[in-house]
Amino acid sequence: MQLFHLCLIIFCSCPTVQASKLCLGWLWGMDIDPYKEFGASVELLSFLPSDFFPSVRDLLDTASALYRDALESPEHCTPNHTALRQAILCWGELMTLASWVGNNLEDPAARDLVVNYVNTNMGLKIRQLLWFHISCLTFGRETVLEYLVSFGVWIRTPPAYRPPNAPILSTLPETTVVRRRGRSPRRRTPSPRRRRSQSPRRRRSQSPASQC
């Protein structure tokens, strides 16, 4: 029971609207998904293995290097920036709470249990959130959604019937361009034929006028 109350504090201590909604959803049985408004879902993210996501420190360094000005700006940039701010703040509060609990629990076993719970469960959720929103800002939301769907299809396909390598997010735009180039010749081929067929007509229609 003490662990239940501690987990409740961990879930509800984040001073963000999104974290509060997650806490209320857990208590009241509401179906609240932090990815739903972005076209994804927790289930879709769950297809990616836990070791796929970089560490929280690496993700925070990436967010700071690429989007620090936008994250610190008082202006509203995009929903992804807002969600990224909330995830960063939530992780900071979780670390503060975990440090406080670790320093005040006398039982080493209980202290290790709390630290492992935060790092394993909440750490994975934060890594997923950070990765998703950083990737949306870097590659575009549609590309990230296409990647999640592609990976989900790949991982659920029996090994004998799927490519040996999983899809790679950074190569998806190149794949999309290749597909578009493969379709474009079919759209461009009629135009030269029309120009070739129309040019003699113009000369024939103009020839009587020139003879007159």
Curated annotation (Swiss-Prot):
It comes from the Viruses. Residues 1-19 form the signal peptide. It holds the Pfam family Hep_core_N. Residues 184-212 form a propeptide. The record marks 183-184 as: Cleavage. It is found in: Secreted; Host nucleus. Residues 165-212 are annotated as: Disordered. GO terms for molecular function: DNA binding; RNA binding; structural molecule activity. Residues 178-205 have a biased composition (Basic residues). Residues 25-27 are annotated as: HBEAG. Keywords: Disulfide bond, Host nucleus, Host-virus interaction, Repeat, Secreted, Signal, Viral immunoevasion. Sequence repeats lie at residues 184-190, 191-198, 199-206. The keyword tRNA-binding does not apply. Belongs to the orthohepadnavirus precore antigen family. May regulate immune response to the intracellular capsid in acting as a T-cell tolerogen, by having an immunoregulatory effect which prevents destruction of infected cells by cytotoxic T-cells. This immune regulation may predispose to chronicity during perinatal infections and prevent severe liver injury during adult infections. This is External core antigen. The gene is C.
